[in-house]
UniProtKB/Swiss-Prot annotation:
It comes from the Viruses. The lineage of its organism: Viruses, Duplodnaviria, Heunggongvirae, Peploviricota, Herviviricetes. Pfam families: US2. InterPro entries: Herpes_US2_varicellovirus (IPR003485). This is US1 protein. Residues 256-268 have a biased composition (Low complexity). Belongs to the herpesviridae US2 family. Residues 230-284 are annotated as: Disordered.
Length: 303
């Protein structure tokens, strides 16, 4: 089956931009996000594969408890950068043999979808900055989930994603799971993009207390292709025109009158054996939307 879902865990500044590299963010914030990632990866949606930047080794102690095959790394700074000093904090990388190494997230994604490994559903988690996450949005198609911490500061070097994090949709408390919760009402209404603010309960474990520099932690299901079609609040949908730049406009169809259809045949509903009848959905079939929202409303996501 390969990769059925991708979740990106990262940090954004007040401009909704990602840091260029991991060392641009406080290590304690990465430690907090790695613990969040470890807890959330217990969702029953495929085998969790958590790939991270190698320079987050010191702040990923909780992820090191996963099986070695489930916690690969990517050396975003090359094979020679074993330790980096940033503001007095040393960002150690994994030593040779400690973790499985991927050349990039894209190569690992292709490996999980190949026939070289066991045919199982995989949930790929990506923990890191733009040097690790940018290819996920640029080169891997399809919608992706995001769990990102928003801080009030501004990164000196950053990358602005093609979509706007948390701008088009209001934030919703993520920990509320009542039957009339807005997320469930949205899912029932057929919406396929939701954004929720991950709430922090007073009775939460001390290991999940967020650092004071974090304004909020946002959960989002992002489809960059769909977000480009949705206008900002208060703006109408843009009218589609023939593409410019040498492309020919589509041919006009002939205005010849179409043959009249029998009103009786059109009004008659299709029978089950009729080829016009829609294919009946089997009880075990799961749509991609139900699979995508499974992790939102599943019992293990109500932490």
């Amino acid at each position: 089956m390969g990769v059925v879902l991708i979740t990106v865990v990262t940090v954004v500044d007040r401009h909704k931009a990602l840091p260029n590299s991991s060392i641009d963010v406080d290590g304690h914030l990465w430690e907090f996000l790695s613990r969040q990632c470890f807890v959330l990866a217990s969702e029953p949606l495929g085998i969790p594969i958590v790939v991270r930047s190698a320079d987050l080794y010191r702040f990923s102690s909780s992820l090191l408890t996963l099986p070695k095959a489930c916690r690969p790394i990517v050396r975003t700074r090359g094979d020679t950068a074993i330790a980096l000093d940033r503001n007095g904090v040393v960002y150690h990388e994994d030593r040779m043999g400690v973790s499985i190494e991927w050349l990039s997230v894209l190569s690992g994604y292709n490996h999980l979808n190949s026939s070289l490994i066991i045919n199982q559903p995989y949930h790929l988690w990506v923990l890191g900055a733009a040097d690790l996450c940018k290819p996920v949005f640029d080169l891997i198609p399809g919608p992706k989930r995001m769990v990102y911490a928003e801080i009030a500061d501004e990164f000196h070097k950053s990358w602005q994603p093609p979509f706007v994090c948390g701008k088009l949709f209001e934030t919703i408390p993520w920990t509320t799971v009542e039957h009339n919760h807005p997320l469930k009402l949205r899912a029932a209404g057929g919406e396929d993009t939701v954004v929720g603010e991950c709430g922090f309960s007073k009775h939460s474990s001390n290991s999940l207390v967020h650092p004071p520099t974090v304004n909020r932690v946002i959960y989002a299901v992002v489809d960059p292709a769909r977000l480009r079609e949705i206008p900002a609040p208060g703006r109408p949908l843009p009218r589609r025109r023939p593409s410019e730049g040498g492309m020919r406009a589509p041919r006009r169809r002939s205005r010849a009158p179409a043959p009249a259809r029998s009103t009786a045949a059109a009004a008659t509903p299709p029978r089950p054996g009729d080829p016009r009848a829609p294919a009946a959905r089997r009880a075990g079939d799961v749509t991609w939307m139900e699979r995508l929202l499974w992790g939102v409303f599943g019992r293990t996501s109500t932490r």
